[in-house]
């Protein structure tokens, strides 16, 4: 059975504890957390593993049995060559292992000229030491702007790729082909919350392997959802998002 995760970017500006409580009440299995390299999370995670929110969050995760799918984000930059606890990537790794996350997510940035494959390989090795698997996200306008570029970056590293799926533009056959092409490089599937508002596309993810999680996220570029989307009943909204993902995972033959 595919795990469904609610990413923090889809319910901004909830704090991590509120995110877990919302996910649990809405029947969502997991969450995705931003813990570094984003200004909006500094209020919670600026002290890394010494942040008070960590000590509030762990008991809530345990009591609700909500798991952490991934922590992010890590920017692929030259600082990865130097192990320094002050760097954002170290914070992500340290918090990821303490929260029991499966993945740490990274992205290339437009202003870094270093080879992203070299930098990702460094991150993938560091992540293994923290019992995490590094994943790369495809971001337009960066050196990793396509799936082909992402596959080249993660090759032979043990890392993987976040596959962005759009209910508005992808078909079930396209998704199936992408999953087969990525093979073991597939980390998890991410679907923009905005494209689930109308119920998504039933059966779109029906052939997704059961071990592959589906994350409800913000936009593919990682930006939070618009504020007007947030000015609604959040519990009802998240329950509807979860129902839309369930429908996309359900094979058409299951209805007969």
Where are these regions (language model features)?
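Conserved anion-binding
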Residues: 129-149
């Amino acid at each position: 059975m595919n795990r469904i995760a609610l990413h923090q970017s889809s319910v901004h500006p909830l704090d991590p504890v509120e995110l877990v409580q919302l996910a649990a009440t809405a029947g969502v299995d997991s969450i995705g957390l931003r813990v570094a390299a984003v200004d909006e999370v500094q209020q919670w995670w600026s002290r890394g593993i010494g942040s008070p929110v960590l000590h509030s969050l762990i008991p809530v995760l345990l009591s609700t049995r909500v798991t952490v799918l991934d922590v992010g984000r890590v920017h692929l930059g030259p600082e990865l060559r130097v192990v320094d606890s002050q760097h954002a990537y170290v914070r992500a790794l340290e918090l990821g292992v303490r929260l029991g996350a499966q993945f740490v997510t990274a992205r290339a940035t437009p202003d870094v000229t270093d080879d992203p494959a070299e930098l990702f390989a460094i991150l993938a090795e560091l992540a293994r030491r923290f019992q995490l698997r590094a994943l790369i996200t495809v971001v337009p306008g960066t050196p990793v702007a396509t799936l082909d570029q992402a596959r080249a970056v993660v090759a032979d590293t043990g890392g993987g790729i976040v596959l962005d799926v759009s209910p508005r533009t992808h078909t079930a056959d396209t998704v199936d082909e992408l999953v087969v092409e990525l093979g073991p490089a597939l980390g998890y599937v991410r679907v923009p919350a905005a494209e689930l508002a109308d119920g998504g596309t039933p059966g779109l993810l029906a052939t997704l392997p059961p071990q592959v999680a589906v994350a409800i996220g913000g936009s593919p570029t990682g930006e939070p959802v618009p504020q007007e989307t947030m000015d609604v009943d959040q519990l009802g909204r998240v329950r509807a998002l979860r129902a839309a993902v369930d429908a996309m995972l359900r094979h058409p033959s299951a209805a007969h």
